[in-house]
Amino acid sequence: MSKQDLIEMEGTVMESLPNAMFRVDLDNGFNVLAHISGKIRRNYIKILPGDRVKVELTPYDLTKGRITYRLKNKK
């Protein structure tokens, strides 16, 4: 599977789960279970409930994803 096959969507983190897993509510109304990518883990970027994030999904399983970016909060 190549990077072109990935589906990238935005959503809001609803819940923090054990083992760096998060429940994310996507903008289209679906809920996914997402883990954080290696770059976010390596750079110690904190993800908290309420944060806006970008999530990559595979076309094979649309219920699981990877958080690739934490969006800036609009104030």
Curated annotation (Swiss-Prot):
Domain S1-like stretches: 1-72
InterPro entries xrefs: NA-bd_OB-fold, RNA-binding_domain_S1_IF1, S1_domain, TIF_IF1
Source domain of life: Bacteria
Keywords: Cytoplasm, Initiation factor, Protein biosynthesis, RNA-binding, rRNA-binding
Main location (coarse class): cytoplasm
One cellular-component annotation, GO: cytosol
Compartments where located: Cytoplasm
GO MF annotations, alphabetized: ribosome binding; rRNA binding; translation initiation factor activity
Quaternary state and interactors: Component of the 30S ribosomal translation pre-initiation complex which assembles on the 30S ribosome in the order IF-2 and IF-3, IF-1 and N-formylmethionyl-tRNA(fMet); mRNA recruitment can occur at any time during PIC assembly.
Assigned protein family: Belongs to the IF-1 family.
Purpose: One of the essential components for the initiation of protein synthesis. Stabilizes the binding of IF-2 and IF-3 on the 30S subunit to which N-formylmethionyl-tRNA(fMet) subsequently binds. Helps modulate mRNA selection, yielding the 30S pre-initiation complex (PIC). Upon addition of the 50S ribosomal subunit IF-1, IF-2 and IF-3 are released leaving the mature 70S translation initiation complex.
Descriptive protein name: Translation initiation factor IF-1
Organism the protein comes from: Synechocystis sp. (strain ATCC 27184 / PCC 6803 / Kazusa)
